[in-house]
Amino acid sequence: MTSYVDASALLKRYVDETDSDVAEALLATDAELVTGRHTVVEVRRNLARMLSGTALAESRAAFATDLSSFSIIELDGATCELAATIAEQTGARSLDALHLGAARRLGTALAFITFDHRQAYIARTLGFRVAGA
């Protein structure tokens, strides 16, 4: 099975937060892991906001290593147009709409892993099976 992973789920691998253990278990499956290109910006921005020094450097390195095992959905025109339509129809925040648009490019027969409750609600209304939130 394929799992689309958003930034909220990935961050829990590098920052000890509520449900970090749940996120780790979801990401440790044999599923093909997929994310959008913009996840790089979102995760690195949040790592820099939450960590510093050696912890930041180690987390960034671990993220880069982990990301190399993901399939990446590029934010091309079709993905952005789909995300814009989702945002218009659901009121999703911009980055959430990009995640949902990227995942929708793969169809709805995948797990959508997020710990963002607003995004999870919208993902469910779009027909995704949500894990995490």
Residue ranges and their predicted role:
Residues M1, D30-L33, S68-S71, G107-A111:
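Short active-site oxyanion
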Residues M1-T35, T39, M50-A61, F128:
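Short, well-structured N-terminal submotif of metal-dependent ribonuclease cores
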Residues V5-D6, T35, A92-R93, F115-D116, ...:
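Histidine- and aromatic-rich ligand-binding microenvironments
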Residues R13-Y14, N46, I122-A123:
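Residues that scaffold the ATP/ADP-binding catalytic core of kinase and kinase-like folds
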Residues V22, E42, L82, Y121-I122:
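Phosphate- and divalent-cation-binding pockets in alpha/beta enzyme and binding domains
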Residues V41-I73, A78-A84:
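Active-site-proximal, substrate-binding regions of enzyme catalytic domains
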Residues S71-Y121, F128:
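Active-site neighborhoods of divalent-metal-dependent phosphate/nucleic-acid chemistry enzymes
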